[in-house]
Every structure is written in structure tokens, then in C-alpha cells.
Swiss-Prot record:
Role of this protein: Sequence-specific endonuclease that cleaves unmethylated GATC sequences. It is involved in DNA mismatch repair.
Keywords, ordered alphabetically: Cytoplasm, DNA damage, DNA repair, Endonuclease, Hydrolase, Nuclease
A GO CC term attached to the entry: cytoplasm
An annotated GO BP: mismatch repair
Protein name (Swiss-Prot/TrEMBL): DNA mismatch repair protein MutH
Lineage of source species: Bacteria, Pseudomonadati, Pseudomonadota, Gammaproteobacteria, Enterobacterales
Similarity field: Belongs to the MutH family.
KW Transcription regulation (keyword) present: no
Classification via CDD domains: MutH-like
SMART domains, sorted: MutH (SM00927)
Entry's localization field: Cytoplasm
């Protein structure tokens, strides 16, 4: 079987994207890095986004860190998801930065969260720390859109969390709020502050926040599609 090659330009169809992702299934991160001419870091401590970058190279992703989807022409977002030996997610999944000001008139339908989760290419990757990074294998991809029930679940959480932000309760939000979608601080250091609305409607400075999918949501999603027991 011939070795796969990274896509040199963004895929033109979902079928092309999925076919390329399927070719990567079973390869280790070290093998894919070597084929792409990259060096595999020893661990992810200083290169937290390295796996995502590697797979973006292989799949011809275009967005980088821009707010649009990774495959903007197709409206598809790429999400790598570290899993254990049973295929269960090991951590929450970052969706996007949570807007803390300027939220008047924003609805679920027009929200950045929904835009990012409208169509997702999930790629599970072995994530157990006992496996050296270079030896971790890439799993079968899944091209997914939320069904009615998933959309309703996410919408309810989003509305609850956004109400708290708009009403000046940002400092009261914990990772426990929201059944499937959570908000928590997203900053490499505690000095990176951003503006938000305070309890009395005043402007305050707080840590940037991000929206994350909880493991119970991604776990059910993967189990349903891959028939994990």
C-alpha cells in the first residue's frame, strides 16, 4: 500500500477530506510527522497544540487560529480528541473563546459556538500518557453534525451561561455550570486579563474564558458512532 501524503491545498469536498482522514487511521503521530518532514516533540508540555497542527498539515486545513472553521470552504471544523484504550475522551474539548462583552442581540443561531460545532471532523488520537507521543496512533475519523437533541442540549447550556455573562455573573460561573457545555478560564498566565461586565453593570477585568464540551457529551457522541461498549 502506498504511503499517504499531506494535502498541499485545502480539500474541495467533504468526501475528499474524509478520505484523507481515513488514510491516516492506524498511523502513529511519529510516522505522520516523519512523512511530513516534522520532528515529533518528546511531550506536549511546550507544544500543546502540536497534534492539531500536524493533522491540519495532513488535511490541508486553511484557518489556523482565525475565527472561521479550519476548512472554511466546506464549513467544517477539525477537532482532535485524546482517548483512552476504550475509546473514551480523556479531556474536555475546546470550542472557542467566550465573548464577555458586546453580547446584546446574540442568539444561539448566530453564536460562535454553534458556528464552530455545525459540522465537525472528529479525529480520536491515543492520549494515555503511558504511550510515548511518537507511538500514539490516530483513530478512525468521524464527520458529525449535531442532531436535534444534541443541538437542544447545547443551546440550553449556552443560553444559561450567556445569561450569566450578560447579567454580570461571570465570576460566579464554574466548570459545573452547564450539563454538556462549560465555560472556564483560558489563559496561559494569570496576567492576561480581558474586559467583562461586573455584578453592578460596571466594566471589570477578568481572565479570558473559553467554551468547552464536557467529556460526557463527546463520550456519548463517540460511543454512538463507534459502538463503544
Amino acid at each position: 500500500m502506498s504511503q499517504p501524503r499531506p494535502l498541499l491545498s485545502p480539500p474541495e469536498t467533504e468526501e475528499q477530506l474524509l478520505a484523507q482522514a481515513q488514510q491516516l487511521s492506524g498511523y502513529t503521530l511519529g510516522e505522520l510527522a516523519a512523512l511530513a518532514g516534522l520532528v515529533t516533540p518528546e511531550n506536549l508540555k511546550r507544544d500543546k497544540g502540536w497534534i492539531g497542527v500536524l493533522l491540519e498539515i495532513w488535511l490541508g486545513a486553511s484557518a489556523g487560529s482565525k475565527p472561521e472553521q479550519d476548512f472554511a470552504a466546506l464549513g467544517v471544523e477539525l477537532k482532535t480528541i485524546p482517548v483512552d484504550s476504550l475509546g473514551r475522551p480523556l479531556e474536555t474539548t475546546f470550542v472557542c473563546v467566550a465573548p464577555l462583552t458586546g453580547n446584546s442581540g446574540v442568539t444561539w443561531e448566530t453564536s460562535h459556538v454553534r458556528h464552530k460545532l455545525k459540522r465537525v471532523l472528529w479525529i480520536p488520537v491515543e492520549g494515555e500518557r503511558s504511550i510515548p507521543l511518537a507511538k500514539r496512533r490516530v483513530g478512525s475519523p468521524l464527520l458529525w453534525s449535531p442532531n436535534e437533541e444534541e443541538d437542544r442540549q447545547l443551546r440550553e447550556d449556552w443560553e444559561e451561561l450567556m445569561d450569566m455573562i450578560v447579567l454580570g455573573q461571570i465570576e460566579r460561573i464554574t466548570a459545573r455550570h452547564g450539563e454538556y457545555l462549560q465555560i472556564r478560564p483560558k489563559a496561559a498566565n494569570a496576567k492576561a486579563l480581558t474586559e467583562a461586565i461586573g455584578a453592578r453593570g460596571e466594566r471589570i477585568l477578568t481572565l479570558p474564558r473559553g467554551f468547552y464540551l464536557k467529556k460526557n457529551f463527546t463520550s456519548a457522541l463517540l460511543a454512538r458512532h463507534f459502538l463503544i461498549q
